[in-house]
């Protein structure tokens, strides 16, 4: 009876070792858990971006104001009898500002 008990105990130890430290054990569980967390963070960023794009699409479909704003900003379009002024910062002030930032 002692040999059978020893054999069963050895089998139990081997099964427990393979369960905890073998394939699909604790190490794999931790790695997969980290992968899931990283994927959830990526999914959250992509969902926020999708929501923003859907809102922009709805805005473009719904009104002329968004289309006009986009045409003015991206294509520099103006209305008839409208004058476009571009304000360029003074180069000397720009150089002074960068010199102060470098200190």
From Swiss-Prot:
Keywords: Cell cycle, Cell division, Cell inner membrane, Cell membrane, Coiled coil, Membrane, Transmembrane, Transmembrane helix
Cytoplasmic side: 1-3
Cell cycle keyword on record: yes
Membrane-related topology note: Single-pass type II membrane protein
Membrane-side (Periplasmic) residue stretches: 22-103
Signal sequence, start to end: none
Compartment(s): Cell inner membrane
Coiled coil (UniProt feature): 33-62
One of the record's GO cellular component terms: cell septum
Residue ranges of the TM segments: 4-21
One Gene Ontology biological process: FtsZ-dependent cytokinesis
HAMAP family in the record: FtsB
Complex formation: Part of a complex composed of FtsB, FtsL and FtsQ.
Function: Essential cell division protein. May link together the upstream cell division proteins, which are predominantly cytoplasmic, with the downstream cell division proteins, which are predominantly periplasmic.
Similarity remark: Belongs to the FtsB family.
Protein name per UniProt: Cell division protein FtsB
Species for this entry: Enterobacter sp. (strain 638)
Gene behind this protein: ftsB
């Amino acid at each position: 009876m002692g040999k059978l008990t020893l054999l069963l105990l050895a089998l139990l130890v081997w099964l427990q070792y393979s369960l905890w430290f073998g394939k699909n054990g604790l190490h794999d569980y931790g790695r997969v858990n980290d992968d899931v967390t990283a994927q959830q963070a990526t999914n959250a960023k992509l969902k926020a971006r999708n929501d923003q794009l859907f809102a922009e699409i709805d805005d473009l479909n719904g009104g002329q104001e968004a289309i006009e704003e986009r045409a003015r900003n991206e294509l520099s379009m103006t209305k008839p009898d409208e004058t476009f002024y571009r304000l360029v910062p003074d180069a000397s002030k720009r150089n002074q500002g960068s010199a102060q930032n470098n200190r």
